[in-house]
């Protein structure tokens, strides 16, 4: 009996140690309509954020996140610093180096740059000619790149496209399963988090020609826990932090967050956590160096 109890205690300690390696992070819980901060394995802060799909921790400690049909920047004291409201669903936001905020409006098909005062200073429409509503599946995550172009995940069309400042497509690649999140890396490669349309959720790294050079999927993880891959963050040493959204399947075993290395070793997971229903995006609080999100 003592041996059994000792084994159970040791297993729990090992489990907690693994979770602790994920460190402190901010997350978006799509199903609960909140964003939150987890520190030392406890949720210490949260804020209302309906259908949130994108979150950043800014250098000043404030949080920038999408709120269904808006974007909000707040302090840890819940003071509003920036707010943008839209009639279109929004899945993407990004604070730019010039202090403006990039916003991707889904149905409207607009790539916006908004000043700190809330004024639209750049507006690029990427809807096909003759279309006034791209529908809810038109766009998910999007990013403004250092070269001034825009990288957009077209969930419905199952492709990723890069647009120039005039809204012209300069690069594209098909992504069976539907892309949700995109990251352009320093070497020009592109990371894409893929959803569940083909029942093959995965993250792929593509070179400049669109060829897959790295991939992680359920083939690499025992138990096939991946359901729908969402927001992610890539670190210079090759580690990748990514969310596994479980809202379409509602499984008993909820694996919300993974941290893996280039060899596809699982460094930590966050699973079955009280206070979390479905995670759609994440941003580490522990990484002070350059990362890609």
Go through each PLM region and give its residues.
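Histidine-/acidic-rich catalytic cores in large beta-rich domains
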Residues: 21-293
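Bacterial N-terminal signal peptides
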Residues: 6-17
């Amino acid at each position: 009996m003592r041996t059994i109890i000792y084994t159970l205690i040791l297993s729990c300690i090992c489990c907690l140690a693994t979770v602790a390696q994920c460190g402190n992070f901010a997350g978006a819980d799509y199903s609960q309509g909140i964003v939150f901060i987890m520190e030392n394995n406890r949720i210490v802060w949260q804020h209302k954020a309906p259908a949130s799909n994108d979150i950043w921790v800014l250098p000043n400690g404030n949080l920038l996140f999408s709120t269904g049909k808006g974007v909000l920047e707040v302090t840890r004291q819940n003071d509003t610093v920036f707010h943008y409201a839209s009639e279109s669903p929004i899945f993407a936001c990004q604070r730019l180096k010039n202090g403006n905020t990039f916003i991707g409006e889904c149905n409207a098909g607009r790539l916006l740059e908004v000043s700190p005062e809330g004024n639209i200073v750049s507006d690029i429409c990427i809807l096909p000619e003759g279309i006034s509503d791209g529908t809810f599946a038109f766009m998910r995550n999007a990013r403004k790149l250092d070269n001034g172009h825009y990288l957009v995940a077209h969930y419905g069309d199952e492709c990723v496209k890069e647009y120039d400042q005039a809204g012209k497509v300069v690069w594209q690649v098909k992504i069976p399963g539907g892309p949700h999140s995109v990251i352009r890396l320093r070497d020009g490669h592109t990371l894409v988090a893929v959803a569940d349309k083909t029942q093959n959720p995965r993250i792929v790294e593509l070179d400049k020609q669109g060829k897959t050079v790295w991939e992680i999927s359920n083939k690499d993880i025992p138990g096939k826990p991946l359901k729908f891959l969402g927001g992610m963050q890539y670190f210079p040493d090759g580690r990748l932090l990514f969310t596994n959204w479980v809202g379409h399947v509602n499984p008993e075993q909820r694996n919300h967050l993974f941290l893996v290395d280039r060899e596809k070793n699982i460094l930590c997971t966050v699973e079955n956590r009280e206070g979390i229903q479905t995670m759609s995006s994440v941003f580490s609080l522990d990484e002070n160096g350059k990362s890609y999100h």
